[in-house]
């Protein structure tokens, strides 16, 4: 007889019903528990009543498809400024200004990137210097040191004050620098002005001798224009000199004196020599005189006219020199027009020497 037959035969009907009830209750409990979990999750997530929404509430969120209004039923105004809320400072900003505001607010603009690049470069330089100190074995390697040597040479050429870039002649806004300016003054940047705090007394004196020197209230830089600067007055220049130099400011030359000295030219004897040559050429033959007159007129027309000094006058000694020069040129006039022209050119090119005591001549007895 089998085991199953024995177990079933030994059970009565009450026990069988109890077992069937237990199995059924387990199945119902599993089914109900799953449904309860699903309903609970739907309620917590907010989609339990999604299919059974009220029709009146649905009308509030209905998409509007009409001309002249947007999807929400509002009248569209194209002139109204669109506003955006900054996620960092929570300010409402116009849409056209939102991007630059966000760059500045978050620190992601151009200036911030430059600052970040400088920080990265400085950190790289510090780490590179530390690595160079640690790795001294590769100093003599040409492949590794070529770039650094090139950079070092470039830095030396930039620091060299005698480089051709620094030796270029600088100009004022109102004219060129005069020849009496100290060459050490070229090391300052004339486009941005000169800082008087870094200059010594001698440098200040040399600068204030030739330049305006009035200190700007905003930039704290000295004006590098001439002493006839139209932007500043004489009182301002005088006050700056007293402030910077103290009592020694009175020893500086005045602007009028500087201009008179620059405008003064010593009397040139070339004009006298050309006149002597003109007087002597009148004693030569007509053909020679015509050619010499034509050449002289051409040269005088090409040469710019000079202003005769009002105090120029010939003394008796000067008259004697003039007569001697006339006799000498008249005696040599018979040699021909070629020698005459050569003599005229040489007399024009040579500058007159210093005045020497006149030699005794036949005119002394007449006087």
From Swiss-Prot:
A zinc finger (SGF11-type) spans 84-105. Coiled coil: none annotated. Residues 132-141 have a biased composition (Acidic residues). It is found in: Nucleus. InterPro entries: SAGA_su_Sgf11, SCA7_dom, SGF11. It comes from the Eukaryota. One of its GO terms (cellular component) is DUBm complex. Residues 199-266 form the SCA7 domain. Residues 318-329 have a biased composition (Basic and acidic residues). Disulfide bonds: none annotated. Keywords: Activator, Chromatin regulator, Metal-binding, Nucleus, Transcription, Transcription regulation, Zinc, Zinc-finger. GO terms for biological process: chromatin organization; positive regulation of DNA-templated transcription; regulation of transcription by RNA polymerase II. Residues 116-125, 280-299, 330-346 have a biased composition (Low complexity). Residues 116-184, 280-367 are annotated as: Disordered. Belongs to the SGF11 family. HAMAP family: Sgf11. The long N-terminal helix forms part of the 'assembly lobe' of the SAGA deubiquitination module. Component of the transcription regulatory histone acetylation (HAT) complex SAGA, a multiprotein complex that activates transcription by remodeling chromatin and mediating histone acetylation and deubiquitination. Within the SAGA complex, participates in a subcomplex that specifically deubiquitinates histone H2B. The SAGA complex is recruited to specific gene promoters by activators, where it is required for transcription. This is Ataxin-7-like protein 3. It comes from Danio rerio. The gene is atxn7l3.
